[in-house]
Amino acid sequence: LSSLVLQRLGADITASDHHPLAGEFLLRNSTLNQLPPIHYACCDWALDYPELGRFNLIIGSDLLYERDHPALLAGFIDRHTLADAQVLIVDPRRGHAASFTRAMAQVGYMQSADLRNGHVCADVPFTGRILNYCRHSA
């Protein structure tokens, strides 16, 4: 959803996922929303994708649901971000955020905020949090 919203706002988007059908779903949703196709890459966090490039902003949602995900995701982010970058991760509190924060610190990121307030819609409170990490070149 965030890719579609950002595409609508005119951002330069590259979406990725490791699910084999995610690219098809993204293309279908882009078409339904009368948007041009969004650049998409199916990625395994353990592998390197030099052709993917480096980004100044990475946004992810509900990514930390397995014990090995914090280290894998932090490594993937490190390989695909510029020296100055921001990372926003929506975390529904599955228990791996602290490990992820430690792994991000090892690759030079500081957690600048833990945004907790908000509502999914008018009557539904958001019980998760948005983890915000920044890295700046020296």
Question: Positions of the model-derived regions?
Answer:
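S-adenosylmethionine-dependent methyltransferases
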Residues: 1-138
